[in-house]
Amino acid sequence: MTDNILGNLQQKKHNMNGNKISGAEAIIKSFLSEGVDTVFGYPGGAIIPVYDVLYGYKKELRHILVRHEQAAIHAAQGYARVTGRTGVAMVTSGPGATNIITGITDALIDSTPLVVITGQVGNSGLGTDAFQETDVIGITQPVTKWSCQVRRAEDIPEAIARAFHIASTGRPGPVVLDITKDAQVHTMEWHYEKCNFIRSYIPYPDISDEAVAQAAELINNAERPMIIAGHGVMISGAEKELAEMAEKADIPVVCTLLGLSSIPSSHPLYKGMAGMHGNIGPNVNTNKCDVLIAIGMRFDDRVTGDTSKYAPQAKIVHIDIDPSEFNKNIRATVPVLGDAKTVLGKLIPMLRKNGHKEWLTTFNRPEAVEYEKVIKPETEPSEGMMNMGEVARRVSEATNNDAILVTDVGQNQMLSARYFKFSRPDSIVTSGGLGTMGFGLPAAIGAKIGQPGRQVCLFVGDGGLQMTIQELGTIFEYKVPVKIILLNNNFLGMVRQWQELFFHKHYSETPMVNPDFVALCKAYGINGEDVVERKDLGQAIKRMLDSDEAYLLNVCIQPYNMVFPMTPAGSNVDNIMLNATEHYI
C-alpha cells in the first residue's frame, strides 16, 4: 500500500479560510459539513485524538457511547433506516475495528448507508504488528462498498466527502475510513467541499427508454400481473409511485421482508408478504402470475426457494439500480436498470388504466385457508400459553398500526413481521440478508434516536436479546424510551423449529436457561414486568406504551410455538406447510 492512498487525488483548496487545524478536528468538522448530528461509537487509543476534539463540539454533535462496537454499527443502521440519512459510527483500531465486521456486513447486504471511522496506529507502526494494529482495509474490503486508509491530515476532508457520496448514492452501503494516528494529530489547512462526482463511479445510470417501453408493453398485455416490492422502493422514496402504478393498472402488490411498509397494510391491493414464512396467496400466485414485476428486490433465496421452479410461467420485469442483481438468481425477461422512483416515473404514463378483478379474486381462497389454519390459531387462541403472533398483533393494534417495528432474528422476526401492520413507510427495521442475532436492541436505540416522535417497538427473543444485552446500559444512560417486547420461550426458537420438523426432535443445544430479565432491567434502571397470563397482556401493553421511559415486557411464550406457513428451504414457493402435518393444496 502506498504511503498516501489518496495521493493521486488533486488536493482541493476550496473554502479555505487559512485556519490550520488537526486532522482529528477535520474529521469532526467534515461530519458537521455533511449535516451529521449523531455519531455512535466507542473510544480507544488509536482514536483518542478525535474524541479529544469531540469534547469541544458536544453542542454541535451528539455522541452515543454504546457498550460494544458491533452495537455502534447496528445503532447507526437503525438510525439510517428510519431517517433515510447516512448513519455514522466511530471506533478504535484492533479489536475495535474487528468488532464492526458483522455490522458492516449486515449493512452491505441490506443496502444501508453508513460511514464508519476506524482509528489506526501511527504510520511508522503500519505492518509491524504494533499494539492493536490490524489490516482493516484487507478485512473490510469484501464487506463494504468502499474502504480506504488515510495517512495524511490534508486528505481527510476529501476522503470523508467521498465516503458520504459513495455510501448514500446508487445502491447504498457501508464505507470504512481507516485513519492513522499521524493523520489525526498532524495539521492541515481546513477546507471542505461536498463530493458530487467521482470518475468511474456512476451511481445513477441512464435509464433505457426502450427497456421501460418493453416493460410497459408486458404489463399492459398481462392478464395476471403481480408486483413484488422490495427494500429498494423505500430507499428510492418510490412509495407514492408504487401505489399509483398498482392502482392505475389494478395490480396486486406483495412485499419482501425488507419491503414491508412500502405500501400501507390496509391498501386494498396489498396482498401480504412473500417468502419462506410469508402469506400463502403471494407465494402460490407467484407461480400463477403471467407477468411478475420485481421492484428494488434481489430474488433472495428466502423469497424464491428452488429457483428452477420459481415463476417458470411468468415473464419477469426486474427494476433495480444494481446491475449485478440482474440474472444472478432469476433470469429477467426485461431488466430495467435505474432508481426505482425514476423508473416508475417513466413507466406509469405508459401504462393503460386496467382491471384484473378475476385475477385479484384468486387471492381470496388462500387468504381464507390461511386465516382458518394459521392466523386464527396463532393470534386468537382460547387456552394455553401465549403465542408470539397474538402478542405482535395486540401490540400493533394498541399503537394504531403506526409504530416503527424493530425486530431481532428468528421466530420473533417472522411472527412480528407477519402480524404487525404498517400505515406509513420506513416502519420496519430488521436484519434481512445476514440474519444477525443481536441486531434488534442496538438497532432500536438508533431508530428511536432517529425518530424520537414515533413509538419504537422492539420484538426480540431470549437468545438474541442476550447477544447485545449490554446495550440496556446505553438505553439507561441516554434515556432512550424504546419499548422492548421480549418473546421468551426458553429456546433458540427457530433452530428448535427446524430440529422438530426436520431433525427428529433432537433439541441439541437449543433449550436455554435464562436470567430474571425484569430484575436485570431493574439493575440497569429500566422498567419491566413479567407477563405470564393472557388476561394480563392487554393492560401490560398499555402500561408499556403509556410510559415515557424505556420499558420491557417479558412475555412468557409457549415453548413449542411454530412459525407457519412455511416453505421448506430449497423447495418450490407453492409447497407450503400449514402446520407440522398439513400442506396447502
Where do the language-model regions lie?
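Glycine-rich, anion-gripping cofactor-binding loops and their flanking helix/strand elements
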Residues: 81, 231-317, 422-454, 468-469, ...
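Glycine-rich, acidic loop regions that bind phosphate or pyrophosphate groups
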Residues: 5-6, 118-159, 259-363, 541
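Thiamine diphosphate
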Residues: 48-123, 127, 131-132, 276, 281-292, 296-300, 414-492, ...
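Active-site diphosphate/adenylate-binding microenvironment
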Residues: 24-28, 32-37, 45, 50-55, ...
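Phosphate/pyrophosphate-binding active-site segments
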Residues: 5-18, 154, 192, 217, ...
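Glycine-rich phosphate/diphosphate-binding loops that line cofactor/substrate pockets in enzymes
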Residues: 24-36, 78-84, 108, 166-171, ...
